[in-house]
A protein has these predicted regions:
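A positively charged, amphipathic N-terminal helix/segment that binds anionic biomolecules
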Residues: 17
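Conserved NAD+-utilizing ADP-ribose enzyme module
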Residues: 1-14, 22-128
């Protein structure tokens, strides 16, 4: 059980989400970055987190960028619900619930903006 109560997140607030460099192409997130895992898409409520804190919670923080999404805009996407789901060690944890078909994932790509740029994926050098 969590020690933090679930709260109602205002439409005017923002969410942060880590995006691993494998889910980027040409500096932009690809639709596959926006998918449910364990029932929802894990994000963090900006009221209780910063972009740096969000990034630091990744397995290898340096492999991730962080995007920002406006809660009201996320709620305006088809069948998407924003629910504060705090965890014992992360009061900011928030799930975005709802099916994320290709159309919805493309819309997530359009509504997000980088607050921490992703690292460039190293390119393989050709041997001569």
């Amino acid at each position: 059980m969590t020690v933090w109560p679930a709260e109602t997140i205002p439409h005017t607030d923002d969410l942060y989400m880590r995006v691993h460099r494998q889910w980027t192409r040409d500096g932009a997130p690809v639709p596959g970055a926006f998918q449910n895992r364990d029932g929802g898409m894990s994000t963090e409520w900006a009221h209780y987190s910063t972009p740096d804190e969000t990034r630091s919670r990744g397995r290898v923080p340096a492999d991730n960028g962080v995007v920002k999404m406006h809660v009201g805009t996320v709620r305006g996407l088809p069948n998407q619900t924003v629910v504060h789901t705090p965890e014992k060690t992360n009061r900011a944890h928030t799930d975005v619930l709802g099916e994320k078909d290709e159309e919805v994932r493309l819309k997530f790509c359009r509504i997000c903006s980088w607050v921490i740029d992703p690292p460039r994926t190293p390119t393989k050098r050709s041997s001569k």
